[in-house]
């Protein structure tokens, strides 16, 4: 049974394991069945191919009916097949029996020793300890140095890895087990081919004395040409795959280019024909990894198939040279055919032929240069492994040279004792491919961590600077607030002083009832409380809106993070798909190699048949039966080729199906990527809309501030007008009072003078009439005069009292004027302060707007960075999960295969032991037969010609050689089985350790990921909170400033009105003595005006309460809708969020997160509806307020300018509604002051 194949072990990249089985099972030369098995076990070939033919040789059983060939089966080595075919072609029945029956090798031990010593010094560094026998085998003998060892050493001259093919007899019952154990990689197949070629040469040279047949290797050169075709197919597949990967990279764009894992320096982007040189040092490093025996051999040992990959530009000429070298390796030495019958010089002739006639191989390889270059490149890639290997190789070479110089009889069993621990140490080294993949993953994780840490540090520094600026702004605002409070306390103190002065007046408390003043104060307090409540409501609304927007931003950030994780996972999936495609291509290439090898075998067999026919013409009578057998063999080979082609077609179909599946997976991945990009665009749109809303609100606030400034300026102008009018009123009042006093005194004097004159006239008449009565009445008249004098005195006293009262009133007026001048000065100072503060606030608002824009840009950058970080983390998690799944599956498969192999090995060991015992018995029989035949030969020498004696001797020698070869094959099978066991155990241990390492690394990666996400979330939350706090504080400061301005305006107006009322009441009290009726009418008029004012205020308060209620309803509706939308979004987030061990990271394998609906569209519609509703309410309130103001201000001289432009926000509407009632009150008070004048 002959099999070539490759086996994949250890997961994604399998370490190859060579196994070659060459078994021929014959019961006898003429009648038993010969079975040949050629297969590729493992993943590449699903079943082997067997063919059998029957040989019917005539006359052979009569000669050897009682010999060893009567046994049911014969095990033939692969090296003896050439000799057996030559003997069959020539009709040499004794030669065939010589191959099938064991006998003495006929080769001197010293000659074999010399040939090995000639081979070893030339290539010390390429010695393979695995090909040497082990001391642990008790059946091994120092003289039984097999030809496989020689072939391994000869293969070193061809720059081929010295992994000798293991030869084992295969039983028909256990062909399935041999399929599993016969797996090997392409490189080992090439090694086996070169070993077969070199091993066939000495056996061909043995018969040079007899038949003068030229020695040439047929199978290897055909195999090499087929391997070149396979390598071409491999290159085409790899180029196609890399083109597909490049297209995918271009579609992904900058994301993949930014976060892709750098390829290994040993691998090239495309295996084009122009990128490879003609030197062996350009061979990729990955081709020599994971090959058993590479740990013991030198780093520069490269298989022939790999060397052919380095000559693509000169593919045809190099192939011709190589094929020519393999077809005619001894083209110049055909004259040097062996002519002597002795076998002592076989090895010398063989070495001469090999060393003198190899133009093709010397043409391709530069041994010294390539050796050093390859060793240096391997050290650059993996310095630790190379140094160990070189040391081990040097020690091995020294030991080999020492052992070869000793005697072969005494020291051969102890030659390799020192090599076993070294080989075990070298075999325990881990493969480079697994290490490099782990190193690249670890380095990528470290780079991502460092990038993220740097970004976080920069963000922390920026936020610390922003915090410092916010603290300074808060300090300035607090200082300004304290100044405002001090000013308000001073104003309240002046107001209280004015009220105490007014309370000291005499007739005020009697004229105006205290109840009305109390009600007026209560109404004012209620209005102030309502205004404060409105301000609190506005503040709460703004805070709720900001909080909701924070939550929305957090959700957007989470969605972006999930999208980035998904993108990374898709990138990793693409990489795994590419790896699987590469594996499939390798399988296809190996299958093509098998097909090409079968074609080569056919061609070689046909050539052998032609040569045999040429030689058989003189001996047709003896070889007619053998020609029939060869014809049957040819037919069976053709059938086998047909079966192999069928299997190749089936494997191709399977590979096509796999490719279709991979393309479908790639399309699914593309669709997922498109969906993710759409979701990212939607999130960006929502972010832009939120930013526009914030900017609109800021613009509205600036417009409101401008309106308030204009209103303040108008109020200042109105105050100045009122002050001018008050001064004119005071001057007029003073003149009127003075005129009234003078007129009253003049009138009183005139009336008194007229009365006295009338009385004097009457008395004078009476004196004239009654001169007599006057004297009697003188006393009465004197009394009357005294009474008149007392009256005059009383009138004079009254005049003095009135003059004193006027002086007091003048003093009071002077005091009032002084207070007015002081208040005017204070007003001017406060106005200046307000103007300066307004300017500062405007500048601060501009700076705050700039900072807000900067914060928004920084937030966008942070979100982008977070998206990038989450994408990386997602891709890493995906790779870890896929690697774990692959390792679990690989571990399970390996365990199952190891169990099967152990069982099959146990069974085979039993069978081999049985065969070994059987062969021992056979050897004993052969020795007995040999002794009997020697006696028969001595008797037959007299009668039989010398040629028969020679043929019998050769027959016996061949029989002994066959038995020895079968024994050695059994020993090698046992050794290979033990090695396979050890290798399987080591692979299981390595896989377990690798799984544990991966689990630990995954735990560490998840822990680092959680820490990074928590830090990022905390920082983002802190930054958002800080930005929101700054906005809230600025809004609160602006609201407080507006409230303070309003309070100042209202307090100033109230004080002015109270002063005017006090002055008017004093004037009324003075005028009341002379003009009671006029004063009564005036009081009634004032009362009516006051009642109208109270009604107007009540109506305005009712309207304000209505507006506040409407705003409260709107705010409640908004909060309810926002809570509903928030609950929906949370519900969808929880529904789509996958479950993992960590709470922060979602399951990346969940596909629902990619197809879920986007929620913020509904939010936008709700917000638009609420804004339209608020606009309608604002228009209604504006119309009502303008109508009321127009109705109340028709009779006034000065009208307050109405707000011409209204913003679309609810905050501006509330500010306008709060400001308008104060202007209405001022207008009504002005009307009250102007009506009496």
From Swiss-Prot:
Biased composition, class Basic and acidic residues, residue ranges: 1-11
Q: Where is this region: Disordered?
A: 1-26, 120-181, 403-435, 480-519
Recite the UniProt keywords alphabetically.
Coiled coil
Segments of skewed composition (Polar residues): 129-150, 167-178, 403-417
Low complexity composition-biased segments:
493-502
Q: From the UniProt record, list the coiled-coil ranges.
A: 440-595, 636-939, 965-1042
The answer, when asked if Coiled coil is one of the entry's keywords, is: yes
User: Does the keyword Coiled coil belong to this entry?
Assistant: yes
In terms of PANTHER family, this protein maps to: COILED-COIL DOMAIN-CONTAINING PROTEIN 144A-RELATED
Question: Which family does this protein fall into?
Answer: Belongs to the CCDC144 family.
Q: What is this protein called?
A: Putative coiled-coil domain-containing protein 144C
Traced from the root, the source organism's taxonomic lineage reads: Eukaryota, Metazoa, Chordata, Craniata, Vertebrata
């Amino acid at each position: 049974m002959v099999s070539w194949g490759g086996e994949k072990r250890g997961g994604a990249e399998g370490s190859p394991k060579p196994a070659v089985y060459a078994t021929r099972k014959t019961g006898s030369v003429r009648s038993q069945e010969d079975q040949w098995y050629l297969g590729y076990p493992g993943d590449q070939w699903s079943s082997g191919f067997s063919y059998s033919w029957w040989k019917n040789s005539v006359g052979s059983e009569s000669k050897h009916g009682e010999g060893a060939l009567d046994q049911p089966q014969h095990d033939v080595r692969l090296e003896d097949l050439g000799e057996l075919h030559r003997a069959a072609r020539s009709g040499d029945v004794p030669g065939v029996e010589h191959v099938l029956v064991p006998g003495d090798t006929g080769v001197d031990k010293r000659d074999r020793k010399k040939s090995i010593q000639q081979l070893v010094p030339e290539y010390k560094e390429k010695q393979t300890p695995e090909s040497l026998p082990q001391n642990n085998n008790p059946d091994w003998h120092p003289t039984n140095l097999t030809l496989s060892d020689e072939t391994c050493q000869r293969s070193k001259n061809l720059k081929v890895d010295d992994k000798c093919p293991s030869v084992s007899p295969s039983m028909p019952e256990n062909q399935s087990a041999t399929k599993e154990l016969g797996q090997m990689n392409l490189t080992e197949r090439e090694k086996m081919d070169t070993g077969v070629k070199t091993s066939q040469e000495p056996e061909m040279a043995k018969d040079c004395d007899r038949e003068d047949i030229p020695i040439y290797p047929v199978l290897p050169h055909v195999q090499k040409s087929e391997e070149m075709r396979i390598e071409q197919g491999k290159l085409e597949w790899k180029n196609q795959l890399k083109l597909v990967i490049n297209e995918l990279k271009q579609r992904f764009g900058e994301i993949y280019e930014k976060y892709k894992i750098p390829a290994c320096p040993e691998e090239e982007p495309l295996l084009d024909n122009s990128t490879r040189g003609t030197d062996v040092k350009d061979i990729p490093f990955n081709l020599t990894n994971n090959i058993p025996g590479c740990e013991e051999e030198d780093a520069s040992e490269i298989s022939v198939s790999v060397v052919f990959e380095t000559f693509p530009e000169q593919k045809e000429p190099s192939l011709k040279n190589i094929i020519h070298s393999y077809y005619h390796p001894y083209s110049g030495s055909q004259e040097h055919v062996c002519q002597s019958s002795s076998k002592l010089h076989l090895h010398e002739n063989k070495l001469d032929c090999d060393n003198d006639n190899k133009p093709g191989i010397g043409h391709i390889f530069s041994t010294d240069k390539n050796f050093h270059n390859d060793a240096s490149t391997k050290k650059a890639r993996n310095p630790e492994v190379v140094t160990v290997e070189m040391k081990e190789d040097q020690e091995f070479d020294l030991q080999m040279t020492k052992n070869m110089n000793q005697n072969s009889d005494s020291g051969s069993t102890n030659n390799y004792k020192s090599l076993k621990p070294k080989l075990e140490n070298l075999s325990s080294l881990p493969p480079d491919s697994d290490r490099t993949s782990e190193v690249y993953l670890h380095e990528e994780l470290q780079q991502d961590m460092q990038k993220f840490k740097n970004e976080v540090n920069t963000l922390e520094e920026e936020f610390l600077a922003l915090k410092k600026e916010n603290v300074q702004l808060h300090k300035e605002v607090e200082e300004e607030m304290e100044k405002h409070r001090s000013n308000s306390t001073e104003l309240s103190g002046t107001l209280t002083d004015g009220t105490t002065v007014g309370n000291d007046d005499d007739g005020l408390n009697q004229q105006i009832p205290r109840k009305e003043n109390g009600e007026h104060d209560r109404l004012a307090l209620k209005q102030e409380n309502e205004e404060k409540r409105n301000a609190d409501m506005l503040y709460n609304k703004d805070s709720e809106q900001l909080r909701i927007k924070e939550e929305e931003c957090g959700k957007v950030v989470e969605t972006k993070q999930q999208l980035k994780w998904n993108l990374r996972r898709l990138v990793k999936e693409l990489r795994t798909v590419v790896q699987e495609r590469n594996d499939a291509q390798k399988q296809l290439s190996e299958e093509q190699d098998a097909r090409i090898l079968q074609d080569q075998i056919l061609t070689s067999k046909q050539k052998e048949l032609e040569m045999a026919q040429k030689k058989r013409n003189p001996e047709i009578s003896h070889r007619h039966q053998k020609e029939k057998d060869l014809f049957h063999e040819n037919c069976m080979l053709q059938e086998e080729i047909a079966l192999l082609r069928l299997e190749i077609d089936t494997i191709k179909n399977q590979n096509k199906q796999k490719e279709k599946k991979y393309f479908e997976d790639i399309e699914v991945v593309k669709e997922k990527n498109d969906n993710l990009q759409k979701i990212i665009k939607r999130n960006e749109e929502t972010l832009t809309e939120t930013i526009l809303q914030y900017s609109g609100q800021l613009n509205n606030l600036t417009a409101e501030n401008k309106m308030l400034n204009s209103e303040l300026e108008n109020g200042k102008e109105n105050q100045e007008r009122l002050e001018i009018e008050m001064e004119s009123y005071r001057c007029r009042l003073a003149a009127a009072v003075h005129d009234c006093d003078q007129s009253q005194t003049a009138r009183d004097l005139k009336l008194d003078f007229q009365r006295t004159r009338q009385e004097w006239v009457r008395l004078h008449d009476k004196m004239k009439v009654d001169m007599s009565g006057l004297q009697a009445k003188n006393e009465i008249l004197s009394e009357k005069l005294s009474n008149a004098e007392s009256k005059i005195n009383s009138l004079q006293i009254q005049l003095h009292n009135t003059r004193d009262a006027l002086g007091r009133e003048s003093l009071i007026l002077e005091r009032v004027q002084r207070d007015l001048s002081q208040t005017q000065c204070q007003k001017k100072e406060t106005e200046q302060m307000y103007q300066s503060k307004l300017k500062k606030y405007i500048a601060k608002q501009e700076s705050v707007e700039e900072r807000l824009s900067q914060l928004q840009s920084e937030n966008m950058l942070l979100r982008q960075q977070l998206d990038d970080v989450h994408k990386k983390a997602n891709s890493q998690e995906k790779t870890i999960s896929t690697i774990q799944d692959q390792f679990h599956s690989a571990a399970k498969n390996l365990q199952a295969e190891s169990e099967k192999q152990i069982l099959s090995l146990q069974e085979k060991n039993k069978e081999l032991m049985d065969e070994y015992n059987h062969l021992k018995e056979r050897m004993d029989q052969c020795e007995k037969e040999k002794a009997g035949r020697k006696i028969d030969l001595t008797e037959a020498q007299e009668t039989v010609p010398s040629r028969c004696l020679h043929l019998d001797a050769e027959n016996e020698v061949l029989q002994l050689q066959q038995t020895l070869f079968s024994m050695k094959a059994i020993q090698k099978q046992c050794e290979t089985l033990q090695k396979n066991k050890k290798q399987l155990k080591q692979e299981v241990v390595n896989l377990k350790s690798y799984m544990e390492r991966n689990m630990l690394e995954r735990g560490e990666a998840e822990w680092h990921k959680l820490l990074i996400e928590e830090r990022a979330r905390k920082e983002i939350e802190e930054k958002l909170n800080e930005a929101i706090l700054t906005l809230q504080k600025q809004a609160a400061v602006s609201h407080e400033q507006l409230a303070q301005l309003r309070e100042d305006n209202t307090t100033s107006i109230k004080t002015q009105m109270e002063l005017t009322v006090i002055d008017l009441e004093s004037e009324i009290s003075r005028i009341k003595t002379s003009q009671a009726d006029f004063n009564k009418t005036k009081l009634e008029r004032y009362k009516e005006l006051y009642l109208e004012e109270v009604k107007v205020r009540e109506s305005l308060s009712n309207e304000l309460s209505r507006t506040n209620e409407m705003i409260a309803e709107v705010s409640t509706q908004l909060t309810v809708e926002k809570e509903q939308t928030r609950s929906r979004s949370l519900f969808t987030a929880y529904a789509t969020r996958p479950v993992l061990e960590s709470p922060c990271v979602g399951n990346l394998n969940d596909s629902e997160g990619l197809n879920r609906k986007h929620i913020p569209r509904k939010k936008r519609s709700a917000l638009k509806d609420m804004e339209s509703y608020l606009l309608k309410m604002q228009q209604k309130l504006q119309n009502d307020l303008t109508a009321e103001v127009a109705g109340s201000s028709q009779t006034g001289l000065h009208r307050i300018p109405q707000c011409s432009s209204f913003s679309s926000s609810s905050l501006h509407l509330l500010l306008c509604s709060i400001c308008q009632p104060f202007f209405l009150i001022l207008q009504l008070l002005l009307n009250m002051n102007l009506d009496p004048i």
